[in-house]
Amino acid sequence: MTRLTYTLLIVNLAAFALETQLGDTQLAALLLWPVGPHFRPWQLLTSAFLHANPLHLATNMFGLWMFGRPVERAVGSLRFAELYGAGLATAGVTQLVVASLLTDKVPTLGASGALFGVLAAFAILFPNRIIVLLFPPIPMKAWVFVLLYGLFELISGVGGLQPGIAHFAHLGGLFGGVLMAAYWRREYQELLV
């Protein structure tokens, strides 16, 4: 059963519907701002349920549906919640650190960081599962896909490619997912000893 995955899908859709009804001032208070006069601690959570536009929402929710269900089935809903939270937290903190080094102080939003945590766990739990990209339709193993995606995010972040996308937040979420999966692996090995 993948109740949490479906719950997260519904919450994100509902948040987007609400987001369209908020005024700019109300919405700005929920975005993740760099540490400074506009930053509030709750933004680490609220920003992860907001999306810039329908395409942003659709791609994140497609990824959550595609990768979240098998991961939640494998680890259970409680651990999936821990994983999602770890990806969300490490993405947010990474974004705050990177934003403190930049002169352009813009807010961020989206579930991508948490999704990258789920993606990392998927690659660790199902490394040999074949994923076929939508465009171009190239089949590859899950671990290869995640490695290449992570490298793309690193190159894009360092090179300043695709401005307006929080590449380092994505990498932070990926790191959070790897940490959780490594913790589970250690715990599992301790049970075997």
Model-derived segments and spans:
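A detector for small-residue-rich transmembrane helices and their helix-helix packing motifs
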Residues: 1-193
